[in-house]
Amino acid sequence: MNRPVLWGAPPAERADAARNRVHLLSTARDMLGEQGPDRLTMDALAERAGLGKGTVFRRFGTRAGIFRALLDDDEHTFQQDVLSGPPPLGPGAAPLERLVAFGRARADFLIDHREIARAALDGSQPIPAGRRTPMSQVHIRMLLGQLSPRPGGLDLDMLTIQLAAALDGPVLLYLSSDELTDAVDSHERRIGQAWQDLVERVCRP
């Protein structure tokens, strides 16, 4: 696996449904910025957006579905940066440089989206669930396969799972807001540096 992978393009939707989706997500973001996640409910979103409750329910299913949709929307932007943005996150840098940059950017993304990620939990799933193989797993496996020389004696498939867990695991998702209030930059730097230390040691030939 050594080519960029597109992580599941969304299915085609009717023009009116697409307009409603964009409007609802924009409205939800406005409400988040003004009131925080606790006040963002299905009923409140329907009222603020000027749409019927049935429309909101069909679009999101549950309150957690609103936050999953917000997370998915931002994930898509992040994926585009990985696939076609400037190096070292995007193409054009050496695989190890891209792996380091990806982990740093991914950790920043998860910390920045910690409130949305927690609100996306619906009680029946341990972490926000997706319909596809986690993007971190796909991308990390691709970059590991491009390393030259390759690390000797390693199971790249299992290493991929371990490295992806270091980024997408519950430790990052459950970092408390109180813990991060005055130290977000410090956490991002420390997690990013720890990721770089890890992959540089593991990927050493």
Located regions from the model:
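Short amphipathic alpha-helical elements of helix-turn-helix/winged-helix folds
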Residues: 27-31, 69, 109, 166
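Secondary-structure edge/capping motif, primarily at the C-terminal ends of alpha-helices
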Residues: 82-90, 114-124, 170, 174-178
